Amino acid sequence: GALYFFFESKAALFEEIVEETAEDLKRIMGDFTDQEKQLHPEEYDRILMEFIWENKDIAKILMDGAEGTRYENFREDACTKMEQILNERFQKECGQEVDHELVHILVQMKFQGYCELLRGNCSREKLLEISRILQICSSQSLLAIEAELNRKQ
């Protein structure tokens, strides 16, 4: 209770706790779109999941407890960024955009997988292994969608 006296509100306390982690997550997500830092998706996911593991408690409250703070749209903003990346990939690989609802659903599925890993109580090794397998599933799904789009052209 005494900690609240140093902050004007619960939201201000929350923001102080999550700010550094949130900014680091934004930077990591931004690195994925930076052409000069372009990584293979599996390597990107490994870096992201390592960071999340190292900051698990703060990442949990950022994803599930940000309502009423300036971070309440953090999850939606991250998903929007992922949707943009996926749309750009389809444009590059297939020369066309994919249905926006489909892209939205694919991103939500992947993000939900991250959140389930975050909420779970698994070891670092298991978290990284499941994340790696989820990335393989995601990549294979995208390849199948790209093949279908190219077949229809």
Language model segments and positions:
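Amphipathic alpha-helical linker/stalk segments
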Residues: 15-44, 60
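Amphipathic alpha-helical packing segments from all-alpha helical-bundle domains
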Residues: 23, 30, 50, 67-94, ...
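Helix-loop "lid/cap" segments that line or gate small-molecule binding pockets
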Residues: 46-54, 65
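Short helix-capping/turn signature of helix-turn-helix
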Residues: 7, 64-68
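Amphipathic, non-membrane alpha-helical segments in soluble helical-bundle scaffolds
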Residues: 11-18, 38, 42-45, 71-76, ...
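Alpha-helical elements of Rossmann-like donor-binding domains used by nucleotide-donor carbohydrate transfer enzymes
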Residues: 12, 47, 77, 81, ...
